[in-house]
């Protein structure tokens, strides 16, 4: 029989791999499976926090939407919301914002014009391509000049249609203002769960890199997002093509249309033959 430590590890793995927008449903199921609720409570704080930050869940504040991300984490329950220039306190267990304060001191003012320009373009980009998406843009100085980190997360949950999904992308853009190129390294994660008469999940992680010219703050941001948009569109197109190919080949191969002798069985003839045999007894 599994030890309590092993049970906690199994439960943690279930929770961290919960499908998009279905975390609390999985929590309820795991709670019912464990012999004692104390086993779940023992690791809930760290597990819930890991799930929320890795999934970049969106939350509502008094000033609008924000993301809970590792990139914006100040402490275990405080997260920078640079767009609204505030720090939010988030209760990972209750899944709600419990406080807000000014972000003065948390934002590097000497590069804020670049961060703000990227933030503006990120908002436009989300509005155009991810209507349910939320973005967060962080900025800091590095040896290479400026590093802008763009986080985008969008989730859809359609239980009546038996599916849910989340798109997450993190782009790290480094450049020297006004000279050279912007190098943007992206990590895109797509998770889809389909659960009508079964349980099928897609989990894909893709690394991308783009370059774009660096100029003034606004032009730098516009050029960077043109390159990012092209890279994400190519990924989206590739996923669509792969699924089309899988539907026409791979999935069909899982269920053989003809038996091994390549001849269809006449089930009506077999049925009639069986009935005739029964009548002749």
Curated annotation (Swiss-Prot):
Cellular component aspect of the GO annotation: cortical actin cytoskeleton; cortical cytoskeleton; cytosol; F-actin capping protein complex
GO biological process entries: actin cytoskeleton organization; barbed-end actin filament capping; response to bacterium
Principal cellular location given in the protein's record:
cytoplasm
Q: Where in the cell is it found?
A: Cytoplasm, Cytoskeleton
Please give the superkingdom of this protein's source. Answer: Eukaryota
What SUPFAM superfamilies does this protein map onto?
Answer: Subunits of heterodimeric actin filament capping protein Capz
Ordered alphabetically, the record's keywords are:
Actin capping, Actin-binding, Cytoplasm, Cytoskeleton
Molecular-function annotations in GO? actin filament binding
Signal peptide feature range: none
Q: Which Gene3D superfamilies match?
A: F-actin capping protein, alpha subunit, F-actin capping protein, beta subunit
In terms of PROSITE patterns, this protein maps to: F_ACTIN_CAPPING_A_1 (PS00748), F_ACTIN_CAPPING_A_2 (PS00749)
The UniProt function text for this chain reads: F-actin-capping proteins bind in a Ca(2+)-independent manner to the fast growing ends of actin filaments (barbed end) thereby blocking the exchange of subunits at these ends. Unlike other capping proteins (such as gelsolin and severin), these proteins do not sever actin filaments.
Q: Give the similarity note.
A: Belongs to the F-actin-capping protein alpha subunit family.
Tell me, how does this one assemble? Component of the F-actin capping complex, composed of a heterodimer of an alpha and a beta subunit.
Q: What is this protein called?
A: F-actin-capping protein subunit alpha
